[in-house]
């Protein structure tokens, strides 16, 4: 059988749409300086689309010659599992116990899913899903922050303080409250291994309040020797 270089225009259309979808998702992540970029998303979407095309076409092509029954969606099912490993690679646990990369991991899985849908010929469904994903990631959080509960208007800061006198801990917490710095978690380290007792506090403040301002407020409290602040 002679090798033919002819490619079905419908296949080229599917690959082109998958490229466009991957480009949109990749740009959204790259503009936010996330580990998932433009090239990665395009590769995932196009590869998923291509493997879906191969799987479906092979399932209906080879039985004519070899009488082999094949599941047209067997290969795409393995894509979802394989992409999961890539998604796990962008989930990070930072030193301040904050988990990041979950949305990026979900976007990887989404790019693969949209590539599968495109490869199977569901163009309109793929574009509709892309639109809903972008609305959910970009627009919906802004709306929720505007009309949602006050908790969404706050941010968490972890403060580690060295104290000159362990008997002033309660007074320091009361003074923090007067300065509108609400503590919701307190940890005390006074095992005698350090020169000063340590108090670690997780606080909530308005999201527009600078972490440096919180630092200055804590530093000004009587009995506080040293301060370390981390925005969570």
Curated annotation (Swiss-Prot):
Name by which UniProt lists this protein: Protein SapB
Main location: membrane
Coiled-coil ranges from the UniProt annotation: none
Gene: sapB
Source organism (scientific name): Bacillus subtilis (strain 168)
Cell compartment(s), UniProt: Cell membrane
Keyword line: Cell membrane, Membrane, Transmembrane, Transmembrane helix
Record-level GO cellular component terms: plasma membrane
Protein family according to the UniProt entry: Belongs to the MgtC/SapB family.
Transmembrane segments: 7-27, 42-62, 72-92, 102-122, 124-144
Membrane-related topology note: Multi-pass membrane protein
Disruption phenotype: Cells activate alkaline phosphatase during sporulation; the same phenotype is seen in the sapB2 and sapB10 mutants.
